[in-house]
Amino acid sequence: ELRDVPGMPKIDLMSYNQLLRKKSLPRATYVFTDFDRIDFWTRELAAKAYRCLTANNARALNDPASARTRLPMLKKLQGEGLNSFSVWDAEMDGLPDRYPVFLRTRAAHRGTQTELLTTPEEARSALDELVRSGLCLSDLMFVEYCAEPIEDGLFRKLAAYCVGDEVITGMSVHDENWHAKYGKEGVASEAHYLDEMQAVKENRHAAGIAGHFKAAGISFGRADFTLVKGKVEVYEINTNPNNSLILDHPFPLRVETDALFHQPLAEAMRAIDTETGGDPILMDHPDLVSQRKRDGYLTRPRWTP
């Protein structure tokens, strides 16, 4: 977790259930996350809370009202020429008109749900099978294949973190499979890890990916991306990224690289930190007040209009 990283400021966690029951909040920096995992009304109320904070000059990152989730974000990135690959809403857009593609869910972080599909017939069959299995049509999307091996049979997925105004090149993963979701131990060489270290030292990808965060309306998160013909191609931006320290590795230089990466990350987190003290901030938006009155005595909220 970020809280385990040396030099990090104090980080407290708060669920949306806890947030929306608060009559006031202490002055602090607030980071809103996980919009693909909450329902529409919780997100709308969170946006009202965000506005209570910013109206009182509190620092808040990731506006719930405007931050884009996976499908609209990827459509936006392609529309602005920042990404070159297409995506299709399986419910609204019909079958893709470019191949190969794969299916995945719009929400959560479950990775690909199919291998590559090369024809409309394969796409239709795969979509029908996933729906029969219980996945919701409204949560499925087609994604055009966009990957390029860095050498024969080896794929690399890159990462960059946005913290306020700072973008920081992160650690990479290597895999023999184009998914490259978690990486596979033993497939990368020392030369690959030396290149990773150099990328972290020079913050190689910050300039090339800053515009993607801005277009997505995200000021805190991790972009997972690759390079295809030298061009950045962003797969997703996770507003609540998993982060773990590398304490042991067959190549010790990876441990060193991980420490080098976490130094500027901690510095960026300290830069957005807020000093404690001052008057609390009232969560006095009428919708928040009304919701608290309705649900104040329930153990579980019924977050509905």
Write out the residue ranges for each language-model feature.
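Short, solvent-exposed loop/turn elements at beta->coil junctions and helix N-caps
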Residues: 90-92, 145-149, 224-226
